[in-house]
Amino acid sequence: MRKKLAKVKVHIQSLDSLLSSMTMPIIGIFIAWGLLASFFIPSGWTPDKNLALMVGIGIQYVIPTIIXFFGGKKIYEIRGGVIAVIIAIAVIAAGQTEAFTKIVGQKSVMFLGVMIFGPIAALILKHTEKFWIHRIKSGFEMLVNNFYLGFLGFALIFPSFYLSIYLIGYIQLGLKLLVEIMQQYKLYPIAAIVIEPAKVLFLNNAINHGVLTPLGLQQVRDSGKSILFLLESNPGPGLGLLVAFLIFFFKRDKKLSSNAASSSPIHLFGGIHEVYFPFVLLKPVLILATIAVGVVGNGILQIFNAGTIAPVSPGSVIAGFLQINKTPLDVAGYALALVLSAVTSLLISLLLLSLTRKKQLKTLQEAQAQVAEMKQTPAKKPRQKDTPAIATKIDFSQVTFVCDAGMGSSTMGAAIFRKELKNQNIEDITVINKAIVDLKDEKVIITISQLYDRVKAKRADATIYTINQFLDKQGYLTIIEKIKNEKN
């Protein structure tokens, strides 16, 4: 049963990775588009009818096409991206038809459609051409490959077009009605019951980019802003929890308190929420605190009718104020939600830590023992081929940090690791970071323990080191010592 649950978790996290890989690389485009909207739409700072045309073109055509390209590229590299763009043409056109408008009630931004059908088209291309791609006569590769991609894309346009009208149409109608019900009956606060536990299970990207972003962008198109972008990205709950750990363990556990202190600015200003997830996992009852605080924060946002004009990603307070709709109520609502959710999270977390102090200490000891045990597992040890007499020498010239999206937390961990290598005068090791889906032939990998199963499934023959979190400096020092011993 446990193995089945582990497999389900891996599949869900893989879906999360695919969804985030379509949107995370183009956050800069969302920011630029959001600035265009904030300046030039009729309700913007400097309305301009002509310049506002760029806003509509960007949200209707450009952004969905790029999302589809990245979705296909993650499945089958450039060829997968190209066929996904062909499918995006069909999906976007479907959202402009009268049949779709009759179902949904309006023309729609087709993010959901391109996120589904783009990767599916790339999968079909990948698994059909593998049977004959290596049999092409020399000199005909370009001709055959391009014609096959073109003909297959042409064939897939038609099912994608009609499925987008009817299947995606009714899905979007259902989601639209759900959002309208939440708005009408003031139900946004209860969204925290789903969002906060899912974040701790590293499904934050799936929720934010797979669900809230497409719905939010549709709301922006209709009303100029959306509260949905703020439901997952509010850094208040995590900030309060980290400060609670800093205070509660200041004398009890200096190392844990120090980790919480160093994680707080990264969480608040860097927008990397993953840094507080391990603290919740040390004491799972704190999930109740994050849920309660999420309800408080979302409630304040709803009372003030606050919203942003574009996705808040990463979930930084800087990005939040940059994208917030520029009216006094919106700005005040966001600021108040941030402050009160942080304070409430601090108080509830301190209360729960105090009430369960003995259990907490025991849990911390068990967690430390578990980490120590992980360091002795094959995942921590340099892997060797099954050769009884001669050990295989490991190539440490490049170390790859791996996280789900390959952007936020792994970038931070790689930077810390580079600094520790520099402090020890080790200059012959290159440190890079990647997403799990981008792994190919890496020899040495560092990741967090929660992602070990997925990394192992992708690169079973690599040397994989796991750490408790990407801010674990002591874990990095331990790995560096092992690398030095292996090299010597």
From Swiss-Prot:
PTS EIIB type-2 domain segment(s): 397-488
Query: Where found in the cell?
Result: Cell membrane
* One Gene Ontology CC term in the entry: plasma membrane
Q: Which of the residues are on side Extracellular?
A: 49-52, 170-178, 310-331
Q: What class of enzyme is it?
A: transferase
PTS EIIC type-2 domain residues are 15-362
* Membrane topology of this protein: Multi-pass membrane protein
Q: Which reaction does it catalyse?
A: D-mannitol(out) + N(pros)-phospho-L-histidyl-[protein] = D-mannitol 1-phosphate(in) + L-histidyl-[protein]
Q: Which residues lie on this side of the membrane: Cytoplasmic?
A: 1-26, 74-147, 200-289, 354-488
Alphabetized, the UniProt keywords read: Cell membrane, Kinase, Membrane, Phosphoprotein, Phosphotransferase system, Sugar transport, Transferase, Transmembrane, Transmembrane helix, Transport
| Gene Ontology biological process terms from the UniProt entry | phosphoenolpyruvate-dependent sugar phosphotransferase system
According to its UniProt record, the EC number is 2.7.1.197
Quote the Gene3D superfamilies the UniProt record gives.
Answer: 3.40.50.2300
Primary location? membrane
Subunit structure comment from the entry: Homodimer.
Q: What does this protein do?
A: The phosphoenolpyruvate-dependent sugar phosphotransferase system (sugar PTS), a major carbohydrate active transport system, catalyzes the phosphorylation of incoming sugar substrates concomitantly with their translocation across the cell membrane. The enzyme II CmtAB PTS system is involved in D-mannitol transport.
Protein name stated in the entry? PTS system mannitol-specific EIICB component
Q: Which organism is it from?
A: Mycoplasma pneumoniae (strain ATCC 29342 / M129 / Subtype 1)
